[in-house]
Amino acid sequence: MASEQSSPEINADNLNSSAADVHVQPPGEKEWSDGFYDKEVINGNTPDAPKRGFLGYLIIYLLCYPVSFGGFLPGWDSGITAGFINMDNFKMNFGSYKHSTGEYYLSNVRMGLLVAMFSVGCSIGGVAFARLADTLGRRLAIVIVVLVYMVGAIIQISSNHKWYQYFVGKIIYGLGAGGCSVLCPMLLSEIAPTDLRGGLVSLYQLNMTFGIFLGYCSVYGTRKYSNTAQWRIPVGLCFLWALIIIVGMLLVPESPRYLIECERHEEACVSIAKINKVSPEDPWVLKQADEINAGVLAQRELGEASWKELFSVKTKVLQRLITGILVQTFLQLTGENYFFFYGTTIFKSVGLTDGFETSIVLGTVNFFSTIIAVMVVDKIGRRKCLLFGAASMMACMVIFASIGVKCLYPHGQDGPSSKGAGNAMIVFTCFYIFCFATTWAPVAYIVVAESFPSKVKSKAMSISTAFNWLWQFLIGFFTPFITGSIHFYYGYVFVGCLVAMFLYVFFFLPETIGLSLEEIQLLYEEGIKPWKSASWVPPSRRGASSRETEAKKKSWKEVLKFPKSFN
């Protein structure tokens, strides 16, 4: 095999290829329509997956990290926006003047729009840019949407006393972040090894929580400025995050599924080999490429992918689309953005003079809790995570809302708040965020990223994710009005939603732990009952241990095992 190192220059040819001018000589003379992999080539033995030591795991996570960093963009916006709405200079530039108090303020409408315009852009961007993944490749599409994100940041920074210009910039900024919310989990799910797919897709959510945390820290650091640096510095830092993603795309392998769909089979082998740190001629690599190719050919026999295909009952795509839409909708109806968007305001209302500091505490809990999710999601399974998350968040939200309604203002809304009740609400908010960050926050993206056949994946993921941003817009815009009217009774609305989430997951969402993307297709086609799906074994593995057993066998000692050269 010969390979030439490609130029680091960012262009379509570079980003659409995992390794330029690479030639792979497959065993035998078979065409790809029949498959490269042949059991006779390896003496009738099915090739084993490559064994990984610490270095192998490290390489996989480092290669996937630049893709997952796309989650940092919406997280950063959530973190800085929560601080902006309480900054004096920001309110002076984009708010209204109240003569009775001599202060600037943001009306409920303007505050709601400030929070929600980003979500509007994201919902449009996710649908509008998803098609680029099929025409230009996943990596180049990500670079394009990140450039759009940078344009939106420029418009925001240049705004001066023109709230409508700032909002336009916020929408364009959201277009790019929305594109990332579809394209990044898509690419992660397609390059990740099956046994690590859940954890690697969870990195997207981990970076979102990292963005929220650093966003809180940023506005905490600039809040004492008296000029526009108070909010322009956090917005300006967006360019640094965007450049990290763009440069990172030079290192990430292209999706082997996209390459095979484009008849670039040899490059697909190189992509699989790169992420697994083996030779492109390894029999296991050829077998993986052959399985992907078989899935692509099977999808082609069903005809060209169209928007109409999303409503197909025969291939169970409609069922999966409904699941994707509802899972992304439920992700917002957990009530998490009630805390993340308005956390600073909420904790001022419970008697804390510096809500910025409390937001940093919440951001820290959110970030480190998501690290736990990355570590365990491929051992516990999707259903168990979601069911536990819905039940535990329900309990936390009931307590939070009840304390707010019954105990926070013992002498009425016009009287002083109870410090003890306020502290208890903060504690249960932290419990709630822990439960959310370890379950629904990462797993919702995993479910959507791995549920759809490659032929309709970009369309189905874009629609599912658009509902996430749509509900984020609705919650972000209407929360100031609702809390102003019913105060902490608002928490009971989310409790009802959490009950519905638990029931839906139990009766309608199948378990996909340990399955390849092609095997998930078979799971849906066989119509397995969701509550029995954890014990389902794909045809190629029948007679072996169940998927849950195999996942549990992999101890953390094995995952963190150092190669001999390290000992």
UniProtKB/Swiss-Prot annotation:
Signal peptide from the UniProt entry: none
Location in the cell: Membrane
SUPFAM superfamilies: MFS general substrate transporter
Record bears the keyword Repeat: yes
Stretches that traverse the bilayer: 56-76, 113-133, 140-160, 171-191, 198-218, 233-253, 337-353, 360-377, 385-405, 428-448, 466-486, 488-508
Start-end of Polar residues biased regions: 1-19
Gene Ontology, cellular component aspect: cell periphery; plasma membrane
Gene Ontology BP terms: carbohydrate transport; hexose transmembrane transport; mannitol transmembrane transport; sorbitol transmembrane transport; xylitol transmembrane transport
Membrane topology: Multi-pass membrane protein
Compositionally biased tracts (Basic and acidic residues): 545-555
Key word Repeat present: yes
One of the record's GO molecular function terms: carbohydrate:proton symporter activity
Region described as Disordered: 1-32, 533-555
UniProt keyword terms in alphabetical order: Membrane, Repeat, Sugar transport, Transmembrane, Transmembrane helix, Transport
Residues exposed to the Cytoplasmic side: 1-55, 134-139, 192-197, 254-336, 378-384, 449-465, 509-567
Main location as per UniProt: membrane
Extracellular side: 77-112, 161-170, 219-232, 354-359, 406-427, 487
Functional summary from the UniProt entry: Probable glucose transporter.
Family: Belongs to the major facilitator superfamily. Sugar transporter (TC 2.A.1.1) family.
Record protein name field: Hexose transporter HXT15
Organism: Saccharomyces cerevisiae (strain ATCC 204508 / S288c)
